Amino acid sequence: MTFTVLVSVRAKRDFNRLIVWLVERDPRAAARLGPLLEAALDSLTEAPSRGRSVGPTTREISIPFGQSAYVIRYRLLGSSVHVTRIWHGLEQR
């Protein structure tokens, strides 16, 4: 079964914020991060249940990058994956 991935406005803002922050510090790393996160989002169409459960319908995947990782949190609702947030693993949350 193929799932539809829907990215919330807030998650899109998270994505852009993370890229802008990294571009200011390391443009080459930022050029790698964008496609990496996009590939992770695309992978949810085929295997959304691979993320760890953090609630009844909420899951998250960790995407290694450098010495840390980025986190994508999402909800499974029927045949849809609703991405709610994206953040760097070292962010104060």
Swiss-Prot record:
Q: Name one Pfam family in it.
A: ParE_toxin
Deleted gene: phenotype? No visible phenotype when deleted singly or as the relBE1 operon.
Q: Where do the TM regions start and end?
A: none
- Does the UniProt entry include the keyword Cytoplasm? no
**Top-rank lineage group of the source organism:** Bacteria
Q: List keywords of the entry alphabetically.
A: Toxin-antitoxin system
- Record's InterPro entries? RelE/ParE_toxin, RelE/ParE_toxin_dom_sf
Which function does this protein serve? Toxic component of a type II toxin-antitoxin (TA) system. Its toxic effect is neutralized by coexpression with cognate antitoxin RelB1 but no other ParD or RelB antitoxin.
Query: Its family?
Result: Belongs to the RelE toxin family.
- Would you tell me the protein name for this molecule? Toxin RelE1
Species for this entry? Caulobacter vibrioides (strain ATCC 19089 / CIP 103742 / CB 15)
Taxonomically, what lineage is the organism?
A: Bacteria, Pseudomonadati, Pseudomonadota, Alphaproteobacteria, Caulobacterales
